[in-house]
């Protein structure tokens, strides 16, 4: 069992999840509470992500998948969408050197076709710069929708059947998983062990629906910009109290 002792105090965290997914929710409400524009909440959320990523890396987490922008988020006010689309540019310019120094590798899942060129260029540059790192994988779900991901996988499999490359009876869970965007992750860590959602909302919101079949869930009322290293520790501590049966007894 993996144990991590934080130097600053005597807390011991057992059984660190290999893959943690985070639905980073509450940026707008955080800003509203402070009488600030919603976009300031997104900016503060960016700083929170950096802190949590470094902490997760030091704890020994293998993959951190963060829900940065969903396919449904395009319906938000255009000024807000434009600001959010620029956040990856700002985040990577500001934080990639530190992430690289901490051996963090950056990947992404989602439909890149709708991303602005500046956003896509920054993302591709960060992926390229960190591709040789062997530590934590920071996996951005950007313009991602779980149902769309499954539909795309089914369509790809159907085409293989249509041209005679694949027999229908050969379709199984492993084959479907290989056609999902998370197939780029290490095989043992493709599915999240723990999914954290901030802000008090109690739903999955189309985030990794296939991959989360046996995930444990942790919900907190804390808005994402206020979620910090201690919040991550609390989530993992709660995770350690669970007994994962995977359908067994």
Curated annotation (Swiss-Prot):
Q: Name one GO molecular function term.
A: manganese ion binding
PROSITE patterns documented for this protein: UPP_SYNTHASE
Keywords (alphabetical) are:
Magnesium, Metal-binding, Transferase
The Swiss-Prot or TrEMBL record lists the needed cofactor(s) as: Mg(2+)
Q: What is its EC number?
A: 2.5.1.-
Residues at which substrate binds = 26-30, 38, 42, 70-72, 74, 76, 197, 203-205
Cystine pairs annotated here are none
The cofactor note from the UniProt entry for this protein is: Binds 2 magnesium ions per subunit.
Question: What GO cellular component term, any one, is given?
Answer: cytosol
A biological-process GO annotation: polyprenol biosynthetic process
Q: Which domain of life is it from?
A: Bacteria
Which Pfam families does the record match to this protein?
A: Prenyltransf
Which InterPro entries does the entry link to? UPP_synth-like, UPP_synth-like_CS, UPP_synth-like_sf
Q: Which residues form the active site?
A: 25, 73 (proton acceptor)
Sites where the protein binds Mg(2+): 25, 216
Quaternary context = Homodimer.
State the similarity comment: Belongs to the UPP synthase family.
Which NCBIfam families does the record associate with it?
PRK14830.1, uppS
Provide the function of this protein: Catalyzes the condensation of isopentenyl diphosphate (IPP) with allylic pyrophosphates generating different type of terpenoids.
| Stated name of the protein | Isoprenyl transferase
């Amino acid at each position: 069992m993996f144990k991590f002792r934080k130097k600053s105090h005597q807390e011991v965290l057992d059984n660190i999840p290999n893959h943690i997914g985070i639905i980073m929710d509450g940026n707008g409400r955080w800003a509203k509470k402070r009488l600030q524009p919603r976009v300031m909440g997104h900016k503060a959320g960016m700083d929170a992500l950096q802190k949590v990523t470094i902490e997760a890396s030091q704890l020994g987490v293998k993959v951190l998948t963060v829900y940065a922008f969903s396919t449904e988020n395009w319906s938000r006010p255009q000024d807000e969408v434009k600001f959010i689309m620029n956040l990856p540019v700002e985040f990577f310019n500001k934080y990639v050197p530190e992430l690289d120094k901490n051996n963090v590798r950056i990947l992404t899942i989602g439909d890149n076709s709708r991303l602005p060129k500046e956003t896509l260029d920054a993302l591709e540059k960060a992926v390229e710069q960190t591709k040789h790192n062997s530590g934590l994988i920071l996996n951005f779900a950007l313009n991602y929708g779980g149902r769309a991901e499954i539909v795309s996988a089914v369509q790809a499999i159907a085409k293989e059947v249509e041209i005679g490359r694949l027999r229908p009876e050969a379709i199984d869970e492993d084959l479907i998983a290989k056609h999902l965007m998370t197939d780029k992750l290490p095989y043992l860590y493709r599915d999240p062990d723990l999914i954290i959602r901030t802000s008090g909302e109690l739903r999955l919101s189309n985030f990794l629906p296939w991959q989360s079949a046996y995930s444990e869930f942790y919900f907190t009322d804390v808005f994402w910009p206020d979620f910090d290293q201690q919040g991550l520790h609390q989530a993992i501590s709660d995770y350690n109290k669970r007994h994962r049966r995977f359908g067994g007894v």
